UniProtKB/Swiss-Prot annotation:
Gene3D superfamilies: 3.30.230.10. It catalyses: Endonucleolytic cleavage of RNA, removing 5'-extranucleotides from tRNA precursor. Belongs to the RnpA family. RNaseP catalyzes the removal of the 5'-leader sequence from pre-tRNA to produce the mature 5'-terminus. It can also cleave other RNA substrates such as 4.5S RNA. The protein component plays an auxiliary but essential role in vivo by binding to the 5'-leader sequence and broadening the substrate specificity of the ribozyme. HAMAP family: RNase_P (MF_00227). It comes from Legionella pneumophila (strain Lens). This is Ribonuclease P protein component. Consists of a catalytic RNA component (M1 or rnpB) and a protein subunit. One of its GO terms (cellular component) is ribonuclease P complex. Its EC number is 3.1.26.5. Keywords: Endonuclease, Hydrolase, Nuclease, RNA-binding, tRNA processing. The lineage of its organism: Bacteria, Pseudomonadati, Pseudomonadota, Gammaproteobacteria, Legionellales. It holds the Pfam family Ribonuclease_P. PROSITE patterns: RIBONUCLEASE_P. NCBIfam families: rnpA (TIGR00188).
Length: 114
């Protein structure tokens, strides 16, 4: 059974600041991925989906669930990742979001040669 463990999350301000201070960036139509290599040996995820970009709470929650689920099932290198939403994301279907995420995970993995 796969679980999204607490250790796989970016929870503290210091964790987010670590990524923001010298992050690499992948930009898609729907998301901005900021990532930076860590020394932990596993990937961690932080989400920043603002009310300004996704107005309805149920849409934000749906998208967070999709992001966490996709992250859980993807074998990623040891990086800290912050995902920022872009306008119009709430109108996308789950299938469309998952397709874009899979392409982006592949791109991110290729940056680290895993």
């Amino acid at each position: 059974m796969f679980a999204f463990k607490k250790a796989q999350r970016l929870l503290k301000k210091n964790d987010f600041d670590f990524v923001f201070e010298s992050a690499k960036k992948i930009t898609t139509e729907d998301f901005i991925f900021l990532f930076r290599e860590n020394k932990l040996g596993y990937a961690r995820l932080g989400l920043a989906l603002s009310k300004k970009m996704i107005a309805k709470a149920h849409d934000r929650n749906r998208i967070k669930r999709l992001l966490r689920e996709s992250f859980r099932h993807t074998n990623l290198p040891a990086v800290d990742i912050i995902i920022l939403a872009r306008p119009g994301l709430a109108k996308k279907t789950n299938l469309g979001i998952n397709t874009k995420l899979n392409k982006t995970w592949e791109k991110l993995t290729s940056c680290y040669g895993k």
